[in-house]
Amino acid sequence: MPFMMNKIAQNGTDDNFYKKIDLLSKSKFGNDFSVIYYKYYADKLRRENVSAKDNLQKIGAVNKWQFCGVFENLNGSGLDIEYEPETYAKNDKKFNANSNGMVHWYNVKDEDEDIIHFYANENEYGEGIMYAQTFIESPDDRTVLLELGSSSEFKAFLNDVEIVRSSDEYINEIGNYLVKVKLSKGMNRLLLKSELNNSTAIFALFSDEKKNRFTDLKYYNTYQNYQPKTLQE
């Protein structure tokens, strides 16, 4: 795909960004994931909401999240501490976040209007640990590819079983880990546990083995009854 950026403005665009991405979206590269993503980003900046929403749906990333934190990350040990939200998904109690007091699962207004979630408000607490969960309804048992992105160290769990632990800290907002997992028929829980830095963001996308996005998966940002698994399963 042709190189897109020149002199970068504060919003991440250059002088010809909009012209280039509009041309690319109509070219043979139009179905490329990166082109769809940047077309969505450009349309959102221009407040072209209909087109932005259309491209958001084409990407098919998880955009229904519920959050819990910020938990203590003393000397960088928090990622290996099993805080209670790791296995307790209901929003009917508060959890002890140690030096950060008591916290609970909560939702963010308008978070489903974006592909990537940035922990902008949570960063006010400084370094710490954040949880994000989503519930995925699948019409059948299926093997899928799960693409995950995070700009900090993280762990991922599917139905309470750890499936990914990042090995390096580097930014790739449209996915830097790809793992093959099995979704069960009915409800599934995906949990991301991330270390907070000044720009922590998360991203998740399910696709088939040919990298086609699913159109029949449903996502929920409130608790849904699911069946926890074990490592043996």
Spell out what each predicted region is.
Residues 15-111, 194-233:
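Accessory carbohydrate-binding/adhesion or oligomerization-edge regions at the termini
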Residues 119-130, 167-171:
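Extracellular beta-rich ligand/substrate-recognition surface
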Residues 130, 150-158, 163:
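Acidic, Ser/Thr/Pro-rich low-complexity intrinsically disordered segments
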Residues 132-144, 180-187:
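Extracellular and analogous surface-interaction loops
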Residues 158-206:
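Beta-strand-rich ligand-recognition modules
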Residues 5-9, 43-45:
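Residue at a conserved register position within TPR or TPR-like alpha-solenoid repeats
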Residues 138, 143-156, 190:
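Aromatic-lined ligand-binding clefts that engage carbohydrates, nucleic acids, or primary amines
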Residues 1-5, 36:
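TPR repeat positional signature
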